[in-house]
Structures are given as structure tokens and as C-alpha cells.
Amino acid sequence: MGEIIEVIYENGILKPLKKLPFKEGEKLIVEVKSTNKEKLLEELKGSIKLGKKVTITRILELEDEVWSSI
């Protein structure tokens, strides 16, 4: 069974943003992914071919345009 759970990292601890559906003492495997867009785009840089140079700043601008039009 897999579930994606949003957390916030504070004072060295991952704190879930909602109540967890697990039993006390249950062992889990955790995969951590950052929601930092700039960091994610930097990691993906070069893996997508667009035929022209596009900066990370422009990609973030386009994302804002798309979401603001919905």
C-alpha cells in the first residue's frame, strides 16, 4: 500500500499536515521529495528537449500564467 503524505520539516522533524492512518509503532518506508520548484527544475535541467533555450525563471513564469488562468 502506498500513500503520499504532505509534511513540513521543522527543527529536524518531518511533521505531517494531516492525521496519519497508521498504527502506533508501525514500521514504514519513507521516500522524501522536495516541493522546492527551483531545485526540482535544476535537477531536471537537460532532460527535456524543447528545441530552444528556456530559463528556469521563464518556466516558473509560465506556470504562474497557467495557474492564474484557471
UniProtKB/Swiss-Prot annotation:
The protein's name: Putative antitoxin PYRAB08720
Any idea what job this protein has? Possibly the antitoxin component of a type II toxin-antitoxin (TA) system.
| Record-stated family | Belongs to the UPF0165 family.
Signal peptide stretch: none
Q: Does the keyword Transmembrane helix apply?
A: no
Output the InterPro entries linked to this UniProt entry. Answer: AF2212-like (IPR008203), AF2212-like_dom_sf (IPR024069)
Keyword Cell membrane attached: no
Q: Which UniProt keywords apply?
A: Toxin-antitoxin system
